[in-house]
Amino acid sequence: MDKQEWKSFFRFIEGGSEAELQQRKDALAGVLQKVTDPGVRSDIRRMLRLIDEEVLIRQNLSSRRQVRRSKSA
């Protein structure tokens, strides 16, 4: 992927809903099974890792917010 494609992907990750992220992850996982080019496979695996990372970050932030709310209540 070129620089512009990566920038577009990062914008998607930052702005996409959890459902959109999951849909993209599922689609990428399906493509990964069909692709044989090592460079493309590497890009897809990186994209999958980045999506997983974003989902975990969002879950962590959500958990922290809930803890703060319960402490202030």
Range-by-range predicted roles:
Residues 1-34:
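N-terminal acidic leader/helix
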Residues 17, 55-57:
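Hydrophobic side chains within alpha-helical segments
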Residues 22, 38-49:
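Short, charged, amphipathic alpha-helical segments
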Residues 59-73:
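Short, charged, intrinsically disordered terminal tails
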